UniProtKB/Swiss-Prot annotation:
Entry function: Cleaves peptides in various proteins in a process that requires ATP hydrolysis. Has a chymotrypsin-like activity. Plays a major role in the degradation of misfolded proteins.
Reaction(s) the record says it catalyses: Hydrolysis of proteins to small peptides in the presence of ATP and magnesium. alpha-casein is the usual test substrate. In the absence of ATP, only oligopeptides shorter than five residues are hydrolyzed (such as succinyl-Leu-Tyr-|-NHMec, and Leu-Tyr-Leu-|-Tyr-Trp, in which cleavage of the -Tyr-|-Leu- and -Tyr-|-Trp bonds also occurs)
Protein name, UniProt field: ATP-dependent Clp protease proteolytic subunit
Gene name of the record: clpP
Matches recorded under PANTHER family: ATP-DEPENDENT CLP PROTEASE PROTEOLYTIC SUBUNIT
Protein species of origin: Agrostis stolonifera (Creeping bentgrass)
């Protein structure tokens, strides 16, 4: 049984024959990125670097970000979100599996009308957490103040991107709120449920999907 990253045949433009390359390298060339783990510094630098590079290479063609993540660090998630708002191409965010905590924050960062959830995906939002309980009292107070600022900032973004009133989002974030794809669409976290898109494009060219998949 093969171990490691799968390899697939890929013909580099200009070459006569295809060569076997890592699957993810092929996907990157097709402007398709994956957030499939906890959001930490390494994966954040990886994704943001690719977004910037792809934007420099082609500032028009869309980028596709598939998300299946339990969430992770606040600052790392905000870094991905801010990069998505900065690069020039539109970014599709596509949730498959789960987008929880900061992963749901990344999900709503996609271009409006281009945020998608697969039919059986689960989306969860809640308030930011911290390990402040380990700190001494002065540090505790400073961290609580900073956490409050971050929470307010994140709540404002959710409210802006979903169209919900600030107070509604703030109350919902007091607890873990899990949603189905349809519930997430009704809430404003995503714009389209995946099966709706399949129905819409079943008799037409799937322009919403990466070029490499159109002949599959």
């Amino acid at each position: 049984m093969p171990i490691g990253v799968p390899k697939v045949p890929y013909r580099i433009p200009g070459d006569e024959e295809a060569t076997w390359v890592d699957l993810y390298n092929v996907m990157y060339r097709e402007r398709t990125l994956f957030l499939g783990q906890e959001i930490r510094c390494e994966i954040t630098n990886h994704i943001t670097g690719l977004m910037v590079y792809l934007s420099i290479e082609d500032g028009i063609s869309d980028i596709f970000l598939f998300i299946n993540s339990p969430g992770g660090w606040l600052i790392s998630g905000m870094a991905i979100f801010d990069t998505m708002q900065t690069v020039t191409p539109d970014i599709y965010t596509i949730c498959l599996g789960v987008a929880a905590s900061m992963a749901s924050f990344v999900l709503i960062g996609g271009e409006p009308t281009k945020r998608i959830a697969f039919p059986h995906a689960r989306i969860m939002l809640h308030q930011p957490a911290s390990a402040y309980y380990r700190a001494r009292t002065p540090e505790f107070l400073l961290e609580v103040e900073e956490l409050h600022k971050v929470r307010e900032m994140i709540t404002k973004v959710y409210a802006l991107r979903t169209g919900k009133p600030f107070w509604v989002v703030s109350e919902d974030m007091e607890r873990d709120v899990f949603m189905s794809a349809d519930e997430a669409k009704a809430y404003g976290l995503v714009d389209i449920v995946g099966d709706e898109m399949v129905d819409e494009h079943c008799d037409t060219d799937p322009v919403w999907f990466p070029e490499m998949f159109k002949d599959w």
